[in-house]
């Protein structure tokens, strides 16, 4: 009789951008065995991969260039891939961030079809601080999230806003998936934007906010990710 694995081995991609220490600590609190890696060959043995990131989209994609092929291959093979903040934006097809610098749209990993766009000039950027999540559909990443400081869910039993003191954001661009079904949760900052996204298969997902800095809700999401890695 086989013994069920109880600890997920998670690789955090070290491509030179991102708050690696806080992400690592958050995942460890969530029960993962975490390793930082600059070697795509180490993805094979991992139960899951986390792509963190803070900074400019173009720089992120340039730095992640050596990882690109391996990330796409692992994701297409069904391995759980979790993008955080810039890492979430990199999961999409393009970003207009470089276009504001006169360079045209920058290409992402194209694992979730869509584009990253800038908040309107009427909004103060970056969007920084605590804000609410409105869970719009089921996904393993948000299982139980509505029960953590939640407001009243919809009549059909789905959705509900998480108390705004549980999701911490720092960003000037936001994801616009081509397909609305890719949106798992939204947040209002002058406009409703996708704050959690996932691909059709469900194994590639991202949060625009930093779960490792988002209190009990963030910890719940990280635990859900670790559980997902163990189950898949």
Curated annotation (Swiss-Prot):
Pathway of action: Amino-acid biosynthesis; L-histidine biosynthesis; L-histidine from 5-phospho-alpha-D-ribose 1-diphosphate: step 5/9
Chain positions covered by the region annotation Insert: 143-159
Listed EC numbers: 4.3.2.10, 3.5.1.2
InterPro entries named among the record's database cross-references: Class_I_gatase-like, GATASE, Imidazole-glycPsynth_HisH
Catalytic site positions: 85 (nucleophile), 210, 212
One GO CC term on file: cytoplasm
Protein localization: Cytoplasm
GO annotation terms (biological process): L-histidine biosynthetic process
UniProt KW keywords: Amino-acid biosynthesis, Cytoplasm, Glutamine amidotransferase, Histidine biosynthesis, Hydrolase, Lyase
Pfam families the record matches: GATase
GO MF annotations in UniProt: glutaminase activity; imidazoleglycerol-phosphate synthase activity; lyase activity
Chemical reaction(s) catalysed: 5-[(5-phospho-1-deoxy-D-ribulos-1-ylimino)methylamino]-1-(5-phospho-beta-D-ribosyl)imidazole-4-carboxamide + L-glutamine = D-erythro-1-(imidazol-4-yl)glycerol 3-phosphate + 5-amino-1-(5-phospho-beta-D-ribosyl)imidazole-4-carboxamide + L-glutamate + H(+); L-glutamine + H2O = L-glutamate + NH4(+)
Residues in coiled coil: none
Statement: the UniProt record of this protein carries the keyword Lyase: yes
Main location: cytoplasm
Residue ranges occupied by any Glutamine amidotransferase type-1 domain in the UniProt entry: 9-232
Keyword Transport on entry: no
Subunit-level organization: Heterodimer of HisH and HisF.
Role description: IGPS catalyzes the conversion of PRFAR and glutamine to IGP, AICAR and glutamate. The HisH subunit catalyzes the hydrolysis of glutamine to glutamate and ammonia as part of the synthesis of IGP and AICAR. The resulting ammonia molecule is channeled to the active site of HisF.
Protein name in UniProt: Imidazole glycerol phosphate synthase subunit HisH
